[in-house]
Amino acid sequence: MTTFTAKPETVQRDWFVVDAAGQTLGRLATEVASRLRGKHKPEYTPHVDTGDYIVIINAEQVRVTGNKASDKMYYRHSGFPGGIKSSNFEGLIAKKPEAPIEIAVKGMLPKGPLGRDMFRKLKVYAGAVHPHAAQQPQELKF
């Protein structure tokens, strides 16, 4: 008997919607990253994208514990000398509410082409409305 290996063309992908209101950033991100990889499925294969599509709504209402709202820093660099920019969690949520969740989940996915394909299945929206009603996403609670 041989080991089962999932084939990319036979993978069944479902759509799920997650409400991030009041959820802790890291705990939400670990569950979402695991589902994007497909680790919750019995046919999980590390080198095949077996994960589901995840739609996250109310991203602006995600929270962090302790003093991280003011202390947690996010950095980016333009590539030019002296081109480093930084902002804290509060500033990033005010400017781009989807960014903290996207950054947290992206850091938990594999680096490389497979991880980029997994990340493309994540859809994050600041408010409660999303344009994926046609896919009939199921509610997912953590």
UniProtKB/Swiss-Prot annotation:
The keyword Nucleotide-binding does not apply. It comes from the Bacteria. One of its GO terms (cellular component) is cytosolic large ribosomal subunit. Keywords: Ribonucleoprotein, Ribosomal protein. InterPro entries: Ribosomal_uL13, Ribosomal_uL13_bac-type, Ribosomal_uL13_CS, Ribosomal_uL13_sf. One of its GO terms (molecular function) is structural constituent of ribosome. GO terms for biological process: negative regulation of translation; translation. Pfam families: Ribosomal_L13. The keyword Ribonucleoprotein applies. SUPFAM superfamilies: Ribosomal protein L13. Belongs to the universal ribosomal protein uL13 family. This protein is one of the early assembly proteins of the 50S ribosomal subunit, although it is not seen to bind rRNA by itself. It is important during the early stages of 50S assembly. Part of the 50S ribosomal subunit. This is Large ribosomal subunit protein uL13. It comes from Pseudomonas fluorescens (strain SBW25).
